From Swiss-Prot:
The keyword Cell membrane does not apply. This is Class E vacuolar protein-sorting machinery protein HSE1. Residues 19-149 form the VHS domain. Keywords: Endosome, Membrane, Protein transport, SH3 domain, Transport. One of its GO terms (cellular component) is vacuolar membrane. Residues 168-187 form the UIM domain. Residues 442-458 have a biased composition (Low complexity). It comes from Scheffersomyces stipitis (strain ATCC 58785 / CBS 6054 / NBRC 10063 / NRRL Y-11545) (Yeast).
């Protein structure tokens, strides 16, 4: 969408003008929320002031201003409390609004949106008797202008499980195309209001079959769909969206329901008869778009600069202006508005998608590192608990470790030498025989000299090699 001029003025009038700027081709919810917050910060004063400004904006002849103002009125009516609801539901505010439905010069799109505003606020206000003028306005539109309320919105299909029988991708694609075409044919009265649709020659079932016969291996994959109708759902797992929204397809959930995500990050299931497939562009189409973009930036932009320079010179009183040249140049550059608008919308949408992707990536990255830190902390605590239960390594009499060998017991040497029956440990049965004296005949590794100086008497070594080793001179 086009971006409105950024302003640092935080006054209510500036915020409303920014949210309803004529350069906005779609609703900017950041601007709308800013207006709602401003009104809620001082409802006693800001409510009446906002209504006065909105009434002035509704007198504009620009369709973009009117459409953005209608969306702002809905947001204020549903989010800014009872004072705002009383003002919006007053006859003084509703009467000029409903009169616009009779204006012949007003675009059909604006009239449909006015009727939708009255209908939506009627549903929101009908439980409050003090807001009855809104219900009266809705009933009046139903009687006098029913065509603006008769939108052929399809019923949501039942949620049937996907059949166990395998279906080819082409059959699934064909069924989606048929559903989309049927819904477009039903929406006769608002065809002119729809966004540009794919060429029917390319998407009709007959031509789809021909394409299948010509090239079976070229099967387009549906990764995105575009909403054809508004869907406001209160079901927990269903996705709510507006007409024209792009939905990224995630997976097939039911036969006629898929799961998808909006550019805002919302995820849910949606019915197939509310959307139309969006196909990936071919390499030729991408190349053609790049050529058009390069031509606009490198060639046509110079013409625009030249027209601006000539107009500036004419404004300053320069009479040496070639009117014919200026007229020709203006005719050439004025036709570029639609192409420039398309490029702005394309790159703005891409910017939104990339920003959202970056935010989601940051959230997932933080969640991953939090999980990793928690795992490391848990592992460290477990190791600390285990190490606290390990028996300390035996030490000598002076408290130092005896180079990997057990030290000679001092006061409690008999405790390690005899068992409870008075039998020496060296004489106890083992898997290799009786006692440990078998090791006495095998050469032992030479211990450090300080260990040999602490050896017990020789007669004690004859039956126990647990706590003593032979001296080097005797081996």
């Amino acid at each position: 969408m086009y971006k409105a001029k950024k302003t640092t003025d935080s006054s209510l009038e500036s915020l409303i003008k920014r949210a309803t700027d004529e350069t906005l081709t779609t609703n900017n919810w950041e601007y709308i929320i800013a207006v709602c917050d401003k009104v809620k910060s001082d409802p006693e004063v800001a409510t009446k002031k906002a209504i006065t400004i909105l009434t002035t904006r509704l007198q504009s002849k620009d369709a973009n201003v009117l459409l953005r103002t209608l969306s702002l009125i809905i947001a204020l009516g549903e989010n800014c409390g009872s004072r705002m609801q009383q003002e919006i539901a007053s006859e003084a505010f509703l009467k000029p609004l409903t009169k616009k439905l009779k204006e012949k010069k007003l675009h059909e799109t604006v009239k449909v949106e006015i009727a939708k505003l009255i209908e939506q606020l009627h549903q929101s206000f009908k439980s409050d008797p003090s807001l009855k003028p809104m219900s009266d306005a809705y009933n009046k539109i139903k009687q006098e202008h029913p065509r603006y309320l008769e939108r052929n919105v399809p019923a949501k299909p039942e949620k049937h499980d996907v059949s166990s029988k395998t279906q080819s991708e082409e059959d699934e694609l064909q069924r989606v195309i048929n559903l989309s075409l049927q819904e477009y044919e039903r929406e006769q009265f608002s065809k002119s209001l729809q966004k540009p649709l794919p060429d029917p020659k390319k998407t009709s079932p007959r031509n789809a079959n021909i394409a299948q016969e010509d090239s079976d291996d070229k099967k387009p994959e549906i990764s995105k769909v575009r909403a054809m109708f508004d869907l406001v759902s209160h079901e927990k797992d269903e996705l709510s969206f507006r007409k024209g929204d792009l939905i990224n397809v995630i997976e097939v959930v039911y036969r006629d329901w898929w799961r998808g995500s909006l550019p805002t990050g919302e995820v849910g299931i949606f019915p197939l008869n509310y959307v139309a497939p969006v196909y990936a562009k071919s390499s030729d189409q991408i190349e053609k778009e790049l050529q058009i973009e390069n031509r606009l930036l490198n060639v046509e932009s110079k013409k625009i600069d030249k027209v601006l320079a000539m107009l500036s010179a004419a404004t300053n009183g320069n009479e040496n202006i070639d009117d014919e040249e200026l007229e020709n140049l203006y005719g050439q550059v004025s036709g570029l508005r639609s192409q420039l608008g398309h490029l702005i919308m394309k790159h703005t949408q891409r910017e939104k998608e990339l920003k959202l992707l970056n935010e989601q990536l940051a959230i997932e990255d933080k969640a991953f590192h939090d999980l990793l830190d928690k795992s490391i902390s848990s592992f460290s605590n477990r190791n600390s608990y285990i190490s606290s239960d390990v028996v300390p390594y035996p030490t000598g009499g002076n408290g130092s470790v005896n180079s990997g060998y057990p030290a000679v017991p001092n006061a409690y040497s008999g405790y390690n030498t005899y068992n409870g029956n008075g039998t020496p440990l060296a004489m106890q049965p083992t898997s290799l025989g009786f006692g440990n004296s078998i090791y006495a005949s095998q050469p032992q590794q030479q211990p450090p000299r300080q260990v040999s100086q602490q050896m017990p008497p020789q007669d004690y070594q004859s039956y126990s090699n647990i706590n003593s080793f032979p001296e080097v001179d005797r081996m």
